[in-house]
Amino acid sequence: MLLPLYGLASFLVLSQAALVNTSAPQASNDDPFNHSPSFYPTPQGGRINDGKWQAAFYRARELVDQMSIAEKVNLTTGVGSASGPCSGNTGSVPRLNISSICVQDGPLSVRAADLTDVFPCGMAASSSFNKQLIYDRAVAIGSEFKGKGADAILGPVYGPMGVKAAGGRGWEGHGPDPYLEGVIAYLQTIGIQSQGVVSTAKHLIGNEQEHFRFAKKDKHAGKIDPGMFNTSSSLSSEIDDRAMHEIYLWPFAEAVRGGVSSIMCSYNKLNGSHACQNSYLLNYLLKEELGFQGFVMTDWGALYSGIDAANAGLDMDMPCEAQYFGGNLTTAVLNGTLPQDRLDDMATRILSALIYSGVHNPDGPNYNAQTFLTEGHEYFKQQEGDIVVLNKHVDVRSDINRAVALRSAVEGVVLLKNEHETLPLGREKVKRISILGQAAGDDSKGTSCSLRGCGSGAIGTGYGSGAGTFSYFVTPADGIGARAQQEKISYEFIGDSWNQAAAMDSALYADAAIEVANSVAGEEIGDVDGNYGDLNNLTLWHNAVPLIKNISSINNNTIVIVTSGQQIDLEPFIDNENVTAVIYSSYLGQDFGTVLAKVLFGDENPSGKLPFTIAKDVNDYIPVIEKVDVPDPVDKFTESIYVDYRYFDKYNKPVRYEFGYGLSYSNFSLSDIEIQTLQPFSENAEPAANYSETYQYKQSNMDPSEYTVPEGFKELANYTYPYIHDASSIKANSSYDYPEGYSTEQLDGPKSLAAGGLGGNHTCGMLVTLSLLKSQIKVLMLVGLHLNCMLDIQIMMNSQHLQCNYVDLKRCFWIKIILKLFLLN
């Protein structure tokens, strides 16, 4: 299917036959999902030929060589949930002036801190298809984390990718196309870390739904079918090698290529093995094949073992509530079950990531994520310690950041329908408007309910740890109403979507009836209008569809504004001839109502494009697994690479709106497109250079008595320490049951041609030239590739040359080149 010539971006779609990397660890061929093979040891960091990373490792190793075992463990270990000022806090090494590391939610704002901006979500940002704006947004977000004294942002999100329309957290990501999200991942990594903050790419990998991310026993009994959550383990996402490389791993590869310093592993299993202790995922795919040099941290409570996870490539346990690390990790090193050089590498990766990203916060965080109180006990959760200043109420907002947030929201608005040039509005077209719907007005619970799980009115974000704390929020009713006043247009707002008599009375005499509708998705944190993160269905909330039908039956100029995390069912009203215009957006942040007004009244020309496909039949979307009758739930990704537009293309399914669709208030034409291959593609990739020599760390003191709780030291409740309690209990363990394939022998060079550099091996190339008549063409490549060689694309625009690079796999057989072009307004 070809995309219609509406809009903003030009797409060059290059797809290929996928090939298995035969030198990688292989699972059985009996089942394409089967189980994860093992890969050991964890590749030692700092051995790849990258000057900036090597310099960071050089400095970090100097520090680690001076540390005791307990000091190293302290860096790898969270101190417990809510046991510090940030979302997550590690221990410190005061002797070497190394402070506790502060890691903080979330992707779009400094969650649980005051006086910050709440930016549009990732899905809204990706709708802009504007690389400069995406970079600027990342810089702005990074600057606010820096201003609050956080060391690392727990974001952005590249998993879930949003392959499931009803998935709860798809809005935190950037859509199911791997190239689009990959471009964004690269830009956001550079932007955030330019501010001296660690970027944490999450969630690795296959975390495409919220149901069953944890093992649960009747958690919601009495509210919904208890069997829905009656499981003994978390969901296993079973993904084949081609889909892993061409879809799900791709954005993480681009983040690594951009120098990302931290990656968070996910709650779910991958092919039968928990993601945070999956040696094939962490040791091979991430640290060997992609050459990741930073550190891997767990999602909160995603760890199910200590020694196995550390040997599998995990570097930091957050928040370490179950204490798999802490004193247990110290014990594992002392009794010989965890090699000391693995602990050395864990600590070094953490420190080198901070150095690489330019983190320098000598005063620490100036806020406390547990409370907005100005003063209180230093250990607020335990209510212990001295009375100290908890929140300095530092205002990190700026005119520049607000402008970026506003611009990102404007360019995230997608115009889906505009019959008879209904929009933009103006006094010459309308004298009276009605603003209708519960989703247009204030939420009766405000904007600060727990983890933003409000959902009873207008919304600026989804809910969960990926939300933000609003300093202000403009509802559609306020924004559109204020703009109508400027135009001297009479308006009325009716917020009751259930008793519709007042709304219909208002609409009957209006020149335009504007119905605002939404659905709210988020993290599985509890009941939000009967939804537990993932959406129960793709129907608009708050009785919106009956209201639209009733209003449009009496007003032939009905305008519908839809806000949702991802796709939503538009079929009940989209073909209604009295519904003359439809606007869509994902969650737009603090300026939601202001942005809608700007677009409705023509102050801004809508330029957003859909970062996913909207189906005609909701049954064509990949479903969320909602109920299981087995204790160990499995999600087989049988669609493989055929997600979103790939699926609709392959199976010739009808769609309502294509990936990349979006109208504007202008008309354009395109002519004389020419594609030339100037250089044949070579399938012979050159291997990357061998790794530098393995670093030999100084051995720490192995006397258990050195690591007991210091005499007179008072331990806080619910706080994790690196100490052991009984030195006499430490005995050498020569019978530990290591996994199959376990080894401590480091490789001299890349395991396969796919490995050897940041984001993969970049050694072979192809040149394609596009000659375009129009000077204002934006080109975006969407390439279904494995991760290895270099592909150079040169774009000629009126004699101006723009070159960009991308990676591919050895033996990349190109089977088709499809040019899909859109004009930039």
Swiss-Prot record:
Family matches, as Gene3D superfamilies: Glycoside hydrolase family 3 C-terminal domain (3.40.50.1700), Glycoside hydrolase, family 3, N-terminal domain (3.20.20.300)
- Keyword Ion transport annotated: no
Q: Which residues are glycosylated?
A: 21, 74, 97, 230, 271, 328, 335, 537, 550, 556, 578, 667, 690, 718, 733, 761
Q: Which SUPFAM superfamilies match?
A: (Trans)glycosidases, Beta-D-glucan exohydrolase, C-terminal domain
Q: Which domain of life is it from?
A: Eukaryota
Fetch the Pfam families from UniProt: Glyco_hydro_3, Glyco_hydro_3_C
Q: Which reaction does it catalyse?
A: Hydrolysis of terminal, non-reducing beta-D-glucosyl residues with release of beta-D-glucose
Annotated pathway: Glycan metabolism; cellulose degradation
Mention one GO biological process in which this protein takes part, according to its record. Answer: cellulose catabolic process
> Which family would the database say this protein is a member of?
Belongs to the glycosyl hydrolase 3 family.
Q: What does the subunit comment say?
A: Homotetramer.
Name of protein: Beta-glucosidase
Q: Which organism is it from?
A: Wickerhamomyces anomalus
Q: The organism's lineage?
A: Eukaryota, Fungi, Dikarya, Ascomycota, Saccharomycotina
